[in-house]
Each structure stands twice: as structure tokens, then as C-alpha cells.
């Protein structure tokens, strides 16, 4: 073996050793992070944890009344931990004040907690899940849920010519349960034929190809679930109101007073306004920048608030309490959309 080859092998071995050591350090830091999380749990939760198991976090999932609900055990869903657990079984238990009860098989589907008809009584319940691998390692997590009212029909506007080659995508907003059987789509109460020409379907998305004005209308998606206790499918629906509009003029006018007249010790504000040529679209975003060029958000002392309606977008810059340090400062208003960008400035002056 030549000296050059020996040196090459040495450096490769050293790199592998360093990488292995680094990976171990990362895993140890992840474990320490979750151990600290365990220490912050309230006593009513921590008392049920098995000290021989690692803690894998908590989850507070969204649920809708009268609809199916499902939740994964937190360590299985957490990107920091999921790679550790491949072949495993999951045990679910309901935590009560002075005891814990095993969740029946009818409330477990594919290892996930499954509630076919979520009612308000479930919103106060806590569930402990224990993941056990084939080699005996275990990790635990705690799941809660909170109620969110499903939205009514969600409006969506599509402008012809924006991305016609990709089509219009409509998302069926079922967020509360996994493991559905299928989704059927309707337009104006008539079932859509998924022919992969005009309409195609990918997961929860309906794609409308070759968009045209006539594609406007009401779109309903019906999600079908099954449950061993219920003879017929469980069906949940969502709807979208799609409005297809002709190609628009995206130019806009930016309006801003060049001076902010202020008084020391008092609040002040100034509004930057973008008026779109077309009142059918609100596609202008307005941002304020401080004298250093940093974007101003919703912070203390100086902050901005954005509103948009009917082709008019406004961003108001607020000063909670004007001090001498603000006098003479110049702030930049930047309005932009996909097509155009404009900027104006204003300077703080004493009245």
C-alpha cells in the first residue's frame, strides 16, 4: 500500500469518525431538549409518564364538532424524533384525575387516535400514547385537542393568464382527520367527472385545467370516511366559491405625504396607500422600512398595520410616543406586486 493511499484512508476514517461524533452530539441534544420539556409539564401530566421511557412532546390538535378526528402520537410526527422509530406499536390511554384507562380498539386506526364523531366532551380530555419498538425502546407523548369551527364557503378569485398552464387548484380543507377513503367533488351541485383532461385530482386538491370564465361557481368536496361501528360512510364536506375574472391591469398608484408632522410626547401616524388600476384585485403588498432599511412589523414603539379592500391597500405607520430621536428620521414605504414596485419616503418633522 502506497503512502498516498494510506494518507487518503486516514483522512476518510477521520472524517467518518468526526461525522459519527457530530451525529451523536445532535441526538444527545435532541434528547436533552425533550427531557427539559418533560420537566416543564404540569404535575397532572408528568405523574403518568414512565421514567423508563423517553418523553416525545405534546400536541394540541384541531377538531371540528360532529366530524371525525384523528391524531398521531407526537414523537411519531415530530421531525426531530420520527427517524428513531420504525418498527413499533402504539398504545393509547385516556388520562383522568386519578387513573388512566386504555383506549378501546374502536378509537384507534392505523396506530392513530381516532374519534368518528367528535363532540364537545372530547375537548377537555388528555391522551397518553406510548410507542414501543421491537428492541424494547419506548417513548411517550401527550395529546389534547381544541375545537375549531369549520369555515363557511371560502371565496377564491382566479385571474385568467396568471398561471393557466398549471390550472386552478382548489384545496379541500379537511384538516381534522386522516385516513379518509376518497373525495368526490361537485360543481353547482353536479358531480364532477375526473377525466384528467378538464379535471384532475391529487390528494385533497382538485385541478381545473384550461381555465375559462365559465369555471366560476360553487365547488363542494365530500370526504368519505369509514368506521367499524357505522354501517354507512361518514361524509364531511367543505365548499369554495370560485370567481374567474379576465386578465387585469396590475398597475397601481402609491400615495404618501412627504412629511409626518409630530409633537414630542404624543402619538402620531401616517398612512401609505396603494390604489390599484383594477378594483377587482388586491395584489399590492405595502411594507415600511425604518431609516436603517429594516422592515417594520407589529412591534413596540413604532409599528405598521396593513389593510386591503376593493383594490385599495393601506399600511399605517404608528408612533406610540414621539421622542426627539425620531425627529428628522426618514421612513420608506414600498409597494409591490408580482409585476411592479414603487417606493416613496416621508420624514418626521416637528409641527
UniProtKB/Swiss-Prot annotation:
Record localization: Secreted
Keyword Secreted found: yes
Family as reported in the entry's similarity comment: Belongs to the interleukin-1 receptor family.
Highest taxon of source: Viruses
Example of a GO cellular component annotation carried by this entry: extracellular space
UniProt keyword terms in alphabetical order: Disulfide bond, Early protein, Glycoprotein, Host-virus interaction, Immunoglobulin domain, Inhibition of host innate immune response by virus, Inhibition of host interferon signaling pathway by virus, Interferon antiviral system evasion, Repeat, Secreted, Signal, Viral immunoevasion
InterPro entries xref list: Ig-like_dom, Ig-like_dom_sf, Ig-like_fold, Ig_sub, IL-1_rcpt_fam, Immunoglobulin_dom
Name this protein carries in UniProt: Soluble interferon alpha/beta receptor OPG204
Source organism per UniProt: Vaccinia virus (strain Western Reserve)
Domain Ig-like C2-type: 65-147, 155-237
Glycosylation sites: 117, 182, 261, 269, 321
Start and end residues of each Ig-like V-type domain: 246-345
PANTHER family, per the entry: INTERLEUKIN-1 RECEPTOR FAMILY MEMBER (PTHR11890), X-LINKED INTERLEUKIN-1 RECEPTOR ACCESSORY PROTEIN-LIKE 2 (PTHR11890:SF44)
GO biological process: symbiont-mediated suppression of host innate immune response; symbiont-mediated suppression of host type I interferon-mediated signaling pathway
Signal peptide: 1-19
Inducing stimuli: Expressed in the early phase of the viral replicative cycle.
GO molecular function: receptor decoy activity
Disulfide bonds: 73-129, 172-221, 272-333
Function description: Counteracts the antiviral effects of host IFN-alpha/beta and key IFN-inducible proteins involved in viral RNA degradation suxh as host OAS1. Acts as a soluble IFN-alpha receptor and thus inhibits the interaction between host IFN-alpha and its receptor.
Complexes and interactors: Interacts with host IFNA1.
Amino acid at each position: 500500500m502506497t503512502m498516498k493511499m494510506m494518507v487518503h484512508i486516514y483522512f476518510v476514517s477521520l472524517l467518518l469518525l468526526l461525522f459519527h461524533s457530530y451525529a451523536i452530539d445532535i441526538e444527545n441534544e435532541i434528547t436533552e431538549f425533550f427531557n427539559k420539556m418533560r420537566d416543564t409539564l404540569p404535575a397532572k401530566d408528568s405523574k403518568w409518564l414512565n421514567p423508563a421511557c423517553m418523553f416525545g412532546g405534546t400536541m394540541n390538535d384541531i377538531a371540528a364538532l360532529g366530524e371525525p378526528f384523528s391524531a398521531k402520537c407526537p414523537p411519531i410526527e415530530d421531525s426531530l424524533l420520527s427517524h428513531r422509530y420504525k418498527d413499533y406499536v402504539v398504545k393509547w390511554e385516556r388520562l383522568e384525575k386519578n387513573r388512566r384507562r386504555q383506549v378501546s380498539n374502536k378509537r384507534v386506526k392505523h396506530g392513530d387516535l381516532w374519534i368518528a364523531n367528535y363532540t364537545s366532551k372530547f375537548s377537555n380530555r388528555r391522551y397518553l400514547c406510548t410507542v414501543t419498538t421491537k428492541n424494547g425502546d419506548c417513548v411517550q407523548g401527550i395529546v389534547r385537542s381544541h375545537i375549531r369551527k369549520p369555515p363557511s364557503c371560502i371565496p377564491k378569485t382566479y385571474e385568467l393568464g396568471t398561471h393557466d398552464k398549471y390550472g386552478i387548484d382548489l384545496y379541500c380543507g379537511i384538516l381534522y382527520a386522516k385516513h379518509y377513503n376518497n373525495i368526490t367533488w361537485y360543481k353547482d351541485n353536479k358531480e364532477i367527472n375526473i377525466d384528467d383532461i378538464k379535471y384532475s385530482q391529487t390528494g385533497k386538491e382538485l385541478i381545473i385545467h384550461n381555465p375559462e370564465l365559465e369555471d366560476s361557481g360553487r365547488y363542494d368536496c365530500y370526504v368519505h370516511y369509514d368506521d367499524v361501528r357505522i354501517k354507512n360512510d361518514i361524509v364531511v364536506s367543505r365548499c369554495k366559491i370560485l370567481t374567474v375574472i379576465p386578465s387585469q391591469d396590475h398597475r397601481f398608484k402609491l400615495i404618501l405625504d412627504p412629511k409626518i408632522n409630530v409633537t414630542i410626547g404624543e402619538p402620531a401616524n401616517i398612512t401609505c396607500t396603494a390604489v390599484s388600476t383594477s378594483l377587482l384585485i388586491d395584489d399590492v403588498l405595502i411594507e415600511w422600512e425604518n431609516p436603517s432599511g429594516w422592515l417594520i412589523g407589529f412591534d413596540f414603539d413604532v409599528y405598521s398595520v396593513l389593510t386591503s379592500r376593493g383594490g385599495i391597500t393601506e399600511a399605517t405607520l404608528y408612533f406610540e410616543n414621539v421622542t426627539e430621536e425620531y425627529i428628522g428620521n426618514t421612513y420608506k414605504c414600498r409597494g409591490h406586486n408580482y409585476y411592479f414596485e414603487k417606493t416613496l419616503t416621508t420624514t418626521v418633522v416637528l409641527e
